Amino acid sequence: PAAKRRNWNNFFRISATLTEPIDTGVLASALDVTARRFPSIAVRLRRGVFWYYLEEIPKTPSIQQEKSCPLAHAPFHEVRQCAFRVLVYKNRVAVEFFHALTDGTGALVFVKTLLAEYLSEKYGLSVPAEKGVLGRLEEASPEELEDSFARYAGDVPASRAESTAYHLSGTPERDGYKNLVTMMIPAEKLRACAKEHGVSVTELLCAAMMQAIGE
């Protein structure tokens, strides 16, 4: 599959920066709890007779110290051991997900729930199960575990007459080199700008990114 190619980024990432250095021991304990709550994410990629499939991992992965560039390519044998990884650098915790596990919303819910459990264990804080934080001791609902493609795709036949997808232009970097652009924006100003345009913050950022790519 495409995920095996070194020039293809097979992971995406969500990170959070706290005000104190991360306690990796507590984070490992919080990850154990969170991984049990998300059986559809705590998985590894396995090869079947005809196709690949996802299988629950028998053991939660170890917390890794981040020593290289974010989103380093994951060799396929690593994905077959565990399809996500948790990395720590000083007071930042990041979770990198194999692209087939979930979308950005599901990944954000996982990270927020992990942080809620971490804060609970580390500081005794009671973080309610709301606003993207799931109850850590609850079992996953049937809706979380189902393959929703069949429900929403239905019996609509696939069309071969699809328009060509947009392709980025430019010269690719060699040897997996990545250029990272980091910026900090005051949340209140960002929300005010989104409100001015009648859109959500997510829609505003996506539109800005697409405009930047197009230009």
Regions found by a protein language model. Give the residues of each.
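Flexible, P/S/T/G-rich "lid" or insertion loops adjacent to the active sites of thioester-utilizing
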Residues: 146-199
